[in-house]
């Protein structure tokens, strides 16, 4: 089933975290719809800013929106005017006091969502799909990832019949929960129809601490407690 389930959702609570960080059973339907509208609005508003993900938190009656982008200058704007404008627009949508944080993605070539959007952008410019896929894989592997897989589906190259093509390099252990696999999906709107783009990037594995490391951590905690009592 590893090939069928979403690579991020299966790892939530293990090595991945939620992108909507709140819990309210009574208002859950309204909050889910509101989060969706905020994300759609920001993705359309910041098309040129290379936005990878948007994390929404709801501490109390406030709203905290964190925008992860590879081009923070476009979002912030001159003298912070861009971010202030975004804050006011979100407050108008939600009627809640809003805080906006900008998080910079320093290595966009290993971000699966940004990689898929870049492929879709180049496909819309009629660049050969195999060349685009190879370039994306080369850049990611040169950045030190352990594996990458790129898949495109649709009327590739203007063909009459839609088909699926994919390229892969390195390992993509989808069924290994400790594997940090990033996943991204985008669509290219071409004159011949839509082309779907999927990207999987295997960055590293998370291993549990050994008994020796856990014992050392416990010793540090005990030493800190002792020092606090003596102080």
UniProtKB/Swiss-Prot annotation:
Domain KH type-2: residue ranges: 38-106
UniProt cross-references to Pfam families, sorted A to Z: KH_2 (PF07650), Ribosomal_S3_C (PF00189)
InterPro entries: KH_dom, KH_dom-like_a/b, KH_dom_type_2, KH_sf_prok-type, Ribosomal_S3_C_sf, Ribosomal_uS3_bac-typ, Ribosomal_uS3_C, Ribosomal_uS3_CS
Gene3D superfamilies associated with the record: 3.30.300.20, Ribosomal protein S3, C-terminal domain
GO molecular function (one): rRNA binding
Record note on quaternary structure: Part of the 30S ribosomal subunit. Forms a tight complex with proteins S10 and S14.
Similarity comment: family membership: Belongs to the universal ribosomal protein uS3 family.
Protein name: Small ribosomal subunit protein uS3
Organism (species): Endomicrobium trichonymphae
């Amino acid at each position: 089933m590893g090939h069928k389930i979403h690579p991020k959702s299966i790892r939530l609570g293990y090595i991945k975290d939620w992108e909507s960080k709140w819990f309210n059973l009574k208002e859950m339907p309204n909050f889910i719809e509101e989060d969706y509208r905020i994300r759609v609005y920001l993705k359309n508003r910041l098309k040129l800013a290379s936005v990878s993900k948007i994390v929404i938190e709801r501490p109390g009656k406030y709203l905290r929106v964190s925008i992860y982008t590879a081009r923070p200058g476009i979002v912030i704007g001159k003298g912070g005017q861009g971010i202030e404008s975004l804050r006011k627009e979100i407050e108008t949508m939600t009627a809640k006091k809003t805080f906006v944080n900008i998080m910079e993605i320093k290595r966009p070539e290993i971000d699966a969502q940004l990689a898929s959007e870049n492929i879709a952008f180049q496909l819309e410019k009629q660049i050969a799909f195999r060349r685009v896929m190879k370039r994306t894989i080369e850049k990611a592997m040169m950045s030190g990832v352990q594996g990458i897989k790129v898949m495109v589906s649709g009327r590739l190259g203007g063909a009459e019949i839609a088909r699926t093509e994919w390229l892969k390099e390195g390992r993509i252990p989808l069924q290994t929960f400790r594997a940090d696999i990033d996943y991204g999906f985008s669509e290219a709107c071409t004159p011949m129809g839509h082309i779907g783009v999927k990207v999987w990037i295997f960055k590293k594995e998370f291993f549990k601490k050994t008994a020796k490391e856990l014992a050392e951590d416990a010793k540090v905690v005990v030493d800190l407690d002792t020092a606090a009592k003596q102080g």
